[in-house]
């Protein structure tokens, strides 16, 4: 028989930087989860993704055990790293802050496609390109 799910927690935590302080501690403490056990497991699983914020979905069961799924970093983080910028622009129509090549967009798509709402690579490229444009990053061939 399957375990009874009592809660689902969605967080974005810096890779390898999970610790009992907010937002992790209070979110897990409310559900009665062993916070240090989660922090150690999360840090171990994300050790090769340092420098990114990692979305994580934690499923909590009635016996206070948990499982968690880590996703790929947000598309905006991948775009900022590929374009070499620290943040997007406040006015993407007038101010361009960086450039991405088509190849860089496809590289981001390959990392991110599992988390997108399409399985078609061309559609995924359009989604990533749209995110880049809204940040003021130009797509060049």
UniProtKB/Swiss-Prot annotation:
Post-translational modification summary for this protein: One or more lysine residues are methylated.
GO biological process, one term: translation
MF term (GO), any: large ribosomal subunit rRNA binding
GO CC field: cytosolic large ribosomal subunit
A Pfam family of this chain: Ribosomal_L11
UniProt keyword list: Methylation, Ribonucleoprotein, Ribosomal protein, RNA-binding, rRNA-binding
Domain of life: Bacteria
HAMAP family: Ribosomal_uL11
Assigned protein family: Belongs to the universal ribosomal protein uL11 family.
Quaternary context: Part of the ribosomal stalk of the 50S ribosomal subunit. Interacts with L10 and the large rRNA to form the base of the stalk. L10 forms an elongated spine to which L12 dimers bind in a sequential fashion forming a multimeric L10(L12)X complex.
Function of the molecule: Forms part of the ribosomal stalk which helps the ribosome interact with GTP-bound translation factors.
Protein name: Large ribosomal subunit protein uL11
Organism taxonomic ancestry: Bacteria, Pseudomonadati, Campylobacterota, Epsilonproteobacteria, Campylobacterales
